[in-house]
């Protein structure tokens, strides 16, 4: 990153006032709303901000693991020969490539 871009970014960040407690509570509430709940646990009690952030981090890590596993599986499928796998006569690796483009 160039020094002029860095200074513009840092000056913009320095000029922004910190979020209010109300804004933070609203952001935490929005974050909690998009996290998967476990058996209504979120409805049973109001989670603290720290708990919501920890759950968000766990969820993001889980999504990364799932994305990695899917990426590995996709790579395996793309390495298959056309004769190895076909769906309704369509070559699966070619089908996957066309979907990715």
UniProtKB/Swiss-Prot annotation:
Key words, A-Z? Growth regulation, Transcription, Transcription regulation
Swiss-Prot/TrEMBL GO biological process terms = regulation of DNA-templated transcription; regulation of growth
UniProt GO MF annotations: protein dimerization activity
The keyword Nucleotide-binding appears for this protein: no
Q: Where are the transmembrane segments?
A: none
Its function, per the record, reads:
Atypical and probable non DNA-binding bHLH transcription factor that integrates multiple signaling pathways to regulate cell elongation and plant development.
- From the Swiss-Prot or TrEMBL record, give the protein name: Transcription factor ILI2
- The gene designation is ILI2
């Amino acid at each position: 990153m160039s020094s002029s871009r860095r200074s513009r970014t840092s000056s913009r960040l320095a000029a922004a006032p910190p979020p209010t407690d109300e804004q933070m509570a609203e952001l935490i509430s929005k974050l909690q709303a998009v996290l998967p709940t476990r058996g209504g646990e979120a409805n049973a009690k109001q989670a603290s901000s720290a708990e919501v952030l920890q759950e968000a981090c766990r969820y993001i890590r889980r999504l990364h693991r799932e994305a990695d596993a899917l990426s590995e599986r996709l790579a395996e499928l793309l390495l298959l020969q056309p004769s190895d796998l076909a769906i309704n006569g369509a070559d699966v690796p070619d089908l996957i490539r066309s979907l990715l483009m």
